[in-house]
Amino acid sequence: MGITRRAKDKAARAERSGGGGGGSSKPKKATFDTTKKKEIGVSDLTLLRTVSNEAINENLKKRFEGAEIYTYIGHVLVSVNPFRDLGIYTDQVLDSYRGKNRLEMPPHVFAIAESAYYNMKAYKENQCVIISGESGAGKTEAAKRIMQYIANVSGGGETGDIQQIKDMVLATNPLLESFGNAKTLRNNNSSRFGKYLQIHFNAQGEPVGADITNYLLEKSRVVGQIVNERNFHIFYQFTKGASQHYRETFGIQKPETYIYTSRSKCFNVDGIDDLAEYQDTLNAMKVIGLSQAEQDNIFRMLAAILWTGNLVFREDDNGYAAVSDQSVVDFLAYLLEVDPARLVHAITIRVLTPRNGEVIESPANVAQATATRDALAKAIYYNLFDWIVERVNQSLRARQAAANSIGILDIYGFEIFEKNSFEQLCINYVNEKLQQIFIQLTLKAEQDEYAREQIKWTPISYFDNKIVCDLIESVRPPGVFSAMKDATKTAHADPAACDRTFMQSINGMSNPHLTPRQGNFIIKHYAGDVTYTVDGITDKNKDQLLKGILNLVQGSQNKFLHDIFPQQVDQDNRKQPPSAGDRIKTSANALVETLMKCQPSYIRTIKPNENKSPTEYNVPNVLHQIKYLGLQENVRIRRAGFAYRQSFEKFVDRFFLLSPATSYAGEYTWQGSYEAAVKQILKDTSIPQEEWQLGVTKAFIKSPETLFALEHMRDRYWHNMATRIQRMWRAYLAYRAESATRIQRFWRKKRTGAEYLQLRDDGHRVLQGRKERRRMSILGSRRFLGDYLGINASTGPGAQMRNGMQLGNNERAVFSCRGEVLEAKFGRSSKPSPRTIVVTNNKFYVVALVMGQNNQPQVILERSFPLGAIKFISTSTARDDWFSLGVGSQQEADPLLNCVLKTEMFTQMKRVMPGGFNLKIGDTIEYAKKPGKMQLVKVLKDAPTPHDFYKSGAVHTQQGEPPNSVSRPTPKGKPVPPRPITRGKLIKPGGPGGRPSRVPVNRTPQPRPSGASAATTSRPVPQPHPAAAAAAAASVSIPSHTRQKSNSSAVRAPPPPPPAAPPAKPKIMAKVLYDFAGQRENELSIQAGQVIEIVQKENNGWWLAKLSGGQAWVPAAYVEEQEAAPVPAPRPPPPPPAAANGARAKPAAPQPPAKRPAAGRKPAALQGRDSAMSMNGSDSSRSSTPTPSLGGSLADALLARKNAMAKKDDDDDW
């Protein structure tokens, strides 16, 4: 059943949900984190105090030297290549960045990957990571780490298609690196091609496919390298690690055998294990799904390329090229599966097609034949690399519906060599395009968007490199690529003529970033000035295979060779095909178009030195990179701009859950515009106004911290909802448990009370209606609790007494109370003495407390009787508290005892003496005063006081309540408001059923001001003096049983003036009688008649005096002390206030301090009823002071004995 929204509940619901959705918890105790590393420099360049290229360089240098290679510029990551393993890419480090925003963790490439993946899932927008920097700066490593992170966090389980996609995506790294990377002078693992990897994800954020686009492989490296560089890694891996089968089938030998791998004299590289990486390449081929036949064909083509390089030509008698070693031709023809003669013919004979259509075959010289041989090798490798990429894409093709994607661009860095040709021009052109994207998306686009959205901010100047891109790629006016193509059209048959024509076009160009020179030209790139050599540049741009080579490939019997050369040879088509410059321009523009459709993340890589040293930091080189990467402009714009912007609709779609006014139970409920909804959301989330601005169509958030706070609140929304449900359920359980507890408590109270009431009623039956009762014995609140002294307790005075009595563990006290025993005195009348009476389930004890050594109380077990030995208990019919125990001992007399709780004691004894309890109730008390000699104690009702006492063999008491009296009804307690069922946010507002309290509350209505009073208060009225007001209040008699109610609405009297400060101690002044010239530094020179201040007096005849700011000693006989001026009288008190009728009141004499009124006096603390003393006629038995310890008990006992001797009476009535 759906939720129905009601208009009348909207405001209340918004109010209720507004305060409880936060779910903020109490902060944890702050502790010092000893493991946290001290930050080196600043982790975000926007926090620099001074924004300059030098300050950025200095900060990067500090962090590089402290092994911190990552630094932020807002959301842009700056990475410095460490040239060593820092151990920062482990699984533990990776997991620490999972689900964290950028500010929660130190800068890292994993944070960029997490941000891209999170934004893709959260905002359903395609993402791309653009990695830029020069060669050797660490772009490829950064790309691999991003792929590593995404593969780990993107879910999908350990098996199935998704995990297979992950494995294949990761396997593309070793495969494409082996075929596309090589050692250069600047980088041991330099990418010699561009790669854009796009990973596709389903709606759950799981990878379902991928595709790779490659750009401009440096195929010239296949046939030649400079000294200390290498060919592509795969050639060294293959020649060193090929299996015996490959060596026999393809004739593979060591790399020193082949010209293409031995020309640079570099076969091994530090940090690269060719054999291990060869195995990684084979494993990657298996993971991607290359069959064994496909792998064999790939390595067959690699062997053909190596043997092609070993084709060496010599001049024949006519000066044309001839093959030096026919065996190499035969083996190469075997590998390509072509006829050897056709192979030689295709390489040494050039086929020319003039404009008239005539076909001319021209023998080639050695240089031309060598160039044709190299062209064949480059074409095979270039097409083989394209086939591998396409084959990988087939394996990575999406197997589910793709929702979004993350692209990773790893492309060659900016290059400046001593000799720069067409390859460097293309590489630097692509980097210019990437720089243009960076400028458009981070600098220009940002400022343009601020202006378009009418956002207030300070513009930042920057360099736009669009003029450089137009210089290279423009058609009208013609740029560098167009000039090359036109030169090829003009003189296509002669490469030298093409170069001269191209140079003439360069000379005719007018561009501030182009400088023509003799045989070369200079382009001012964003990364620096680069000089390009014109010689051979147009031929490389033409990039065409001779038709003889194409015919040779088409005639091969090898099917795989046909697959990697899919294009057909048109013998009659003389139309100029697209040049290499056209292809790279088309690819670069397609890449730009793809990137512009994504939300970019940037990694700017920096190379710290040219020596690949882990410790060297070349300050000038890094400063140059900082300048051409535009880091300073990026920092300035980041500091002045906004970290996040989004359209109103998307912002509301993302964050509407955060406001109770825009959402209810996950549903969007806002009826107004999206812009108003954005304002409401930002208001309800308490985002400060200076942290956001609203443009025309978008909302702008200034700092990333604010965005992270919104994201955190959104992530916590569902947790909070679940917490609310859990809280309500737990509250219900607590309510149910509390209800059950209250029922149980009520039942226990009733049951326990009923037990005690039952004992009390049994006491009435024990007396058999024959003994008069005391008034206190039949109170309705009386309960028979038994152990009043706590003998059964584990601690306290009762436990100490139990230990002194040495009671066993199985002996439990059923009754304990203080009482008295009648002691026989030699030569005089017997006197009562205080004792403690304890009845257990086995015995009857009489215990005495005496003072021992060191004034410490001591427990003396005076007598004990087994309950079975007690033959009878004798008591009178009067209301007295005396009774005797008929023991019938032959050595001791029967005890005659006094106990105020005698009826309860009889009842408890009857419970533990089944069948042996004999209570005698008569006019006299019978007991053996001496062994075997019975005596009767008379009970006389002639006591002058309410308390009974023993004297001369008789107990004197008063008339009591009738013997048939029963206990009065239990008094009802004072009504109190019912306690809430739960605490905090109540389920029930009051008592059971949620009803409000029925306890009447006295509310005194406030009288309305009358006209006269209003007129009176309209002018200032003098207030009474506080003392007089207090005296007047004290003179009012207030009943002690009523409470004074405070009236907060009444005007309070002004506070009394503060007491005056104590008068300052008067100075002691003295008059100088005689002149005295000081002889020492500590003596003061004085003259007669001067008045000086005495600071200190000494008894040695010298006083310390002060004069004109200085102080020193003077002889006391030379001065005379002056009397101090009288202290001024205190200021008189202010006059009393005027009377109410306006007449001035007469001043009244100050009243003496009033006694505290009865109503204001705190009631005395009620003393707990002490059941330990009997109510004899003496104070010894009526002392009701609780005894906190044995010491107190003994003191009370001794005091009681003293009072008993003095015959003092008390007024207690039991």
Swiss-Prot record:
Its main location: cytoplasm. Residues 40-715 form the Myosin motor domain. SMART domains: MYSc, SH3. Residues 1065-1124 form the SH3 domain. Residues 405-487 are annotated as: Actin-binding. One of its GO terms (biological process) is endocytosis. GO terms for molecular function: actin filament binding; Arp2/3 complex binding; ATP binding; hydrolase activity; microfilament motor activity. Coiled coil: none annotated. Residues 955-967, 1037-1050 have a biased composition (Polar residues). Keywords: Actin-binding, ATP-binding, Cytoplasm, Cytoskeleton, Hydrolase, Motor protein, Myosin, Nucleotide-binding, Repeat, SH3 domain. CDD domains: MYSc_Myo1, SH3_Myosin-I_fungi. Residues 1-33, 948-1066, 1122-1196 are annotated as: Disordered. Residues 1053-1065, 1127-1138 have a biased composition (Pro residues). InterPro entries: Fungal_myosin-I_SH3 (IPR035535), Kinesin_motor_dom_sf (IPR036961), Myosin_head_motor_dom-like (IPR001609), Myosin_TH1 (IPR010926), MYSc_Myo1 (IPR036072), P-loop_NTPase (IPR027417), SH3-like_dom_sf (IPR036028), SH3_domain (IPR001452). Residues 719-739, 740-765 form the IQ domain. It is found in: Cytoplasm, Cytoskeleton, Actin patch. Pfam families: Myosin_head (PF00063), Myosin_TH1 (PF06017), SH3_1 (PF00018). Residues 1139-1148, 1156-1196 have a biased composition (Low complexity). The myosin motor domain displays actin-stimulated ATPase activity and generates a mechanochemical force. The tail domain participates in molecular interactions that specify the role of the motor domain. It is composed of several tail homology (TH) domains, namely a putative phospholipid-binding myosin tail domain (also named TH1), an Ala- and Pro-rich domain (TH2), followed by an SH3 domain and a C-terminal acidic domain (TH3). Belongs to the TRAFAC class myosin-kinesin ATPase superfamily. Myosin family. Type-I myosin implicated in the organization of the actin cytoskeleton. Required for proper actin cytoskeleton polarization. At the cell cortex, assembles in patch-like structures together with proteins from the actin-polymerizing machinery and promotes actin assembly. Functions as actin nucleation-promoting factor (NPF) for the Arp2/3 complex. This is Myosin-1. It comes from Chaetomium globosum (strain ATCC 6205 / CBS 148.51 / DSM 1962 / NBRC 6347 / NRRL 1970). The lineage of its organism: Eukaryota, Fungi, Dikarya, Ascomycota, Pezizomycotina.
